[in-house]
Structure formats: structure tokens, C-alpha cells
Amino acid sequence: MWPLDNKRESMIYQRKNNQVSYGEAIGILLLDSPVPFIPGDVANATSYAFPVRFKKVVGFSVKKAIGGDKGIYPALLCAARDLKDNGVRAITGDCGFMALHQNRLKKDLNMPVFLSSLLQIPFIRQLIPENQKIGIITASQRNLTEPFLETIGIKEKNGLVVAGLENSPEFKSAVLDEKGSLDSKKMEAEVLEKAGTLLKKHKDMGAILLECSLLPPYAKGVADKTGLPVFDYMTMIDFVFSAVVKKKYRGYM
């Protein structure tokens, strides 16, 4: 830390609990999945302009996440506590369907928790005119139900238009079937096709939200194609980081 006169400040630091490393403000709970996580993905460290700390939730598969398996919660809580014990200031996840555990986990940890990209929906609604819709591109349209959304305080789906990738060949084989490889060009084409279809059907769409944590690499393409604001996991994580790690401003007048 450097003061304005460019002389090093004298500071005394104290160790915290049993930590052996420091400076990772955002903790990320990862699914137990063999999918390749490319730059831009939530599970790729090069996606961030700041250090993050990852923790795999053993046994928490993609199918369990999308299927709403409540039995995985003890493993999720154990992994989250490890992140907390290692000094993170806020905890997120790498699947929008982790929203099922949002309220319980934040209460049990007593710290900021933001597991799902879908938490941005109320914020986006306030940004755009009331007569405009939010387009959501998700890993599973079938599972993005009103009861599920109610778990994070979204009372109804009015104003939300949804397109699912569960039947898109590359997404299905790479993500849902976990074949162990991913063709990013094919994946991007599938995401852009869904975005284009949504916009064609709903010309009153005012913003797009990419639910799945694997989709941020394609967000710029979606924005370029549609001309709309695009939200995803990375917009949410960057936003929360800016709240839990405050910037010291410097300049002149």
C-alpha cells in the first residue's frame, strides 16, 4: 500500500486463524465436473483481474445441480466453510441452479453469499423499462421453473423469456453429458443462435442474462449480435468484488 507521497507506510499485519495464504476475497464453489473450463469461465482463474479461491464440492455433479438435489447440501456447506476459514469475503458458485441453496448457505455461514447468476434479475428489471423483457439463456429451460425462482425471491416469471441449451448438440455433449472436451466455436454458435431466436421472438427484450457459468466467454458475441446489455456470472462477481474490496482513489485536481 503506497501513500500519495510515494513513501512506504509502516504497517503491522496480524495473522488470521490458521490461514497460510491471503488476498483471495472471492471464494468459488465448483461442481464436481470434468468439463474443460476455458478463459472467461467462472472456473478459470485467468477470467479475473483479482485472485480468487476455488473449492470443489465433491460429488456435486451437473445433473445433481440442475436436478435440484437437496441432499448435497452438507458437502456444499463443508466446502463453503473451508473457503470462509481461508479468508474469503464472499462466496459464489459455478452453476446458476445452486440458487436452491442460496438462502440456507448465507444463513449458516453468516457472510455474503451469491451462488447464482440469477440473483441479478431484480437488478436488471430496475434498469430497463417495465414493458421490456429479460432474455435468459440457461442450461435447462425445463428446470428454470417459477417454484425454483421463488427460492431467490423472484415471485413470477412475467417479463422473463427463456431459451435452454439442453438440446443444443455441443452444449449437451460437453456440459450435460460431460464428454471431457469442448468445442468453443460450436458452443458460441449455439449460444448466439439462442440469443438471435429470443430477440426475433421478443423484439421488446431489453437485456440478456446468461445463467450458466460456462457462458461468459460468449457474452461479447451475444452483445455484438443483439445490441443489448448482457449480464452473466462475471458481471455479478466483479460487482460483488468491488463491494468487499474497496478501491483507494488517487489523482489530482
Positions of PLM-derived features:
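Non-catalytic positions within long, well-ordered alpha-helices that form the structural scaffold/packing
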Residues: 84, 125, 199-201
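Short, acidic/small-residue loops that bind anionic groups at enzyme active sites
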Residues: 104-128, 223-240
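Gly/Ser/Thr-rich loops at beta-strand to alpha-helix junctions
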Residues: 90-102, 114-120, 139-143, 211-217, ...
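N-terminal active-site wall of soluble small-molecule enzyme domains
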Residues: 74-79, 97-104, 108
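C-terminal functional extensions of proteins
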Residues: 215-217, 231-253
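Glycine-rich, highly charged phosphate/nucleotide-binding loops
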Residues: 66-79, 186-194
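N-terminal glycine-rich anion-binding loop in soluble enzyme alpha/beta folds
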Residues: 2-73, 140-182
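A short, acidic, amphipathic alpha-helical segment used as a generic capping/interface helix at domain edges
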Residues: 187-204, 217
